[in-house]
């Protein structure tokens, strides 16, 4: 006699909901992190689109001089941005119900806080969803670990830096030219180009691009021929095939002779781990650098560090960078400062009569 045991299906509405949320058979996996990710990212995206098109000018510096950022107020795709929350609000939590009216909320840049906080929560949940799906499929968790690098970078720019500087008005504007403005001001105030963690980030991003191009070109150049001259080489691969699609020995031999033997990986697994780890670690360091500079632990300062035997300064590139930083800083928020600090130290000429 054969007994057939079947798993008892939950008949409750909550049970069916749980099964649907955690099912890996859905076209798109939702997961418990997705329950929070979907509404937060939809909210951030919707408010961003509406504000980018139609938001009124924002008093970013808190001096009653609003700055326009939306398309309907004279901007284009390049110059448009979501203007950060006003310096008058600082780090205060500023939802719509904290303002006297919607007009006041818009004037003080409330949409920026709403978008940024929902966005950060959403991308963090996306990272958790990657881990959750990997766990349910029996995969290793490194996809979520790799994604933690851009999550850390976004958190550093949109949350940690404003906290360190004391106001959301110091956060990065959500737009193309606003991003460039943020970068220039960051250099002027923190000398980020001379910070070792930023240098590691540059090495990670550009090095990752180089290694990706090298790997892709090596693989493409050492494909195992499965097609004729008149067919695309891509037709020689069938999704899910067990056979190797390229000759790693040939790629290893080529690269080893091009540079030297030990510069080439002979293990496909360690190679792909390296390709993932290099840019991720670099971006981690950049996020850490932004987070330290948020509290004014700035880049190295070698200004006027080289002098001759008479004590006279021999200008170096560090001094050139310093002059550029001063120029950028005095142009920043020029209407907010009656006496820019870099100019206030100059002696005022005495006029007789």
From Swiss-Prot:
Catalytic activity: 2 a plastoquinone + 4 hnu + 2 H2O = 2 a plastoquinol + O2
Annotated residues for binding of Fe cation: 215, 272
Entry annotated with the keyword Electron transport: yes
Regions that span the bilayer: 29-46, 118-133, 142-156, 197-218, 274-288
Pfam family, one: Photo_RC
GO MF annotations, alphabetized: chlorophyll binding; electron transporter, transferring electrons within the cyclic electron transport pathway of photosynthesis activity; iron ion binding; oxidoreductase activity, acting on diphenols and related substances as donors, oxygen as acceptor; oxygen evolving activity
Residues where Phosphothreonine is found: 2
Residues carrying the site annotation Stabilizes free radical intermediate: 190
Entry-linked SUPFAM superfamilies: Bacterial photosystem II reaction centre, L and M subunits
Primary location: plastid
Localization terms from the record: Plastid, Chloroplast thylakoid membrane
Free-text remark on how the cofactor is bound: The D1/D2 heterodimer binds P680, chlorophylls that are the primary electron donor of PSII, and subsequent electron acceptors. It shares a non-heme iron and each subunit binds pheophytin, quinone, additional chlorophylls, carotenoids and lipids. D1 provides most of the ligands for the Mn4-Ca-O5 cluster of the oxygen-evolving complex (OEC). There is also a Cl(-1) ion associated with D1 and D2, which is required for oxygen evolution. The PSII complex binds additional chlorophylls, carotenoids and specific lipids.
Subunit note: PSII is composed of 1 copy each of membrane proteins PsbA, PsbB, PsbC, PsbD, PsbE, PsbF, PsbH, PsbI, PsbJ, PsbK, PsbL, PsbM, PsbT, PsbX, PsbY, PsbZ, Psb30/Ycf12, at least 3 peripheral proteins of the oxygen-evolving complex and a large number of cofactors. It forms dimeric complexes.
HAMAP family, per the entry: PSII_PsbA_D1 (MF_01379)
Protein known as: Photosystem II protein D1
Organism this protein belongs to: Zea mays
């Amino acid at each position: 006699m054969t007994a057939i045991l079947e798993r008892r299906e939950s008949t409750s509405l909550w049970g069916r909901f749980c099964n649907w949320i955690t099912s890996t058979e859905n076209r798109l996996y939702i997961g418990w992190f997705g329950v929070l990710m979907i509404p937060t990212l939809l909210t951030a995206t919707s408010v961003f689109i509406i504000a980018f098109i139609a938001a009124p000018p924002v008093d970013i510096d808190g001096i009653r001089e609003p700055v326009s950022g939306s398309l309907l107020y004279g901007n284009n795709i390049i110059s448009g941005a979501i203007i950060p929350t006003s310096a008058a609000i600082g780090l205060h939590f500023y939802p719509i119900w904290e303002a006297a009216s919607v007009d006041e909320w818009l004037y003080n840049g409330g949409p920026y806080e709403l978008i940024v906080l929902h966005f950060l929560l959403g991308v963090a949940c996306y990272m958790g969803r990657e881990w959750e799906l990997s766990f349910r499929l029996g995969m290793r968790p490194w996809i979520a670990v790799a994604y933690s690098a851009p999550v850390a970078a976004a958190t550093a720019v949109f949350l940690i830096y404003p906290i360190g500087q004391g106001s959301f008005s110091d956060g990065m504007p959500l737009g193309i030219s606003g991003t460039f403005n943020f970068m220039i001001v960051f250099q002027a105030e923190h000398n980020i180009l001379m910070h070792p963690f930023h240098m590691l980030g540059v090495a990670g991003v550009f090095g990752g691009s180089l290694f990706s191009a090298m790997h892709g070109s090596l693989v493409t150049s050492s494909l195992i021929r499965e097609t004729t001259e008149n067919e695309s080489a891509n037709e020689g691969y069938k999704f899910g095939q067990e056979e190797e699609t390229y000759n790693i020995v040939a790629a290893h031999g080529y690269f080893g002779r091009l540079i030297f033997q030990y510069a080439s990986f002979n293990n496909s697994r360690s190679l792909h781990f390296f390709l993932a780890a290099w840019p991720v670690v670099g971006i981690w360091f950049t996020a850490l650098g932004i987070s330290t500079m948020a509290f004014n632990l700035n880049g190295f300062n070698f200004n006027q560090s080289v002098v001759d035997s008479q004590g006279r300064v021999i200008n170096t590139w560090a001094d050139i960078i310093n002059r550029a930083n001063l120029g950028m800083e005095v142009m920043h928020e020029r209407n907010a400062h009656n006496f820019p600090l870099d100019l206030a130290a100059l002696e005022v000429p005495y006029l007789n009569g």
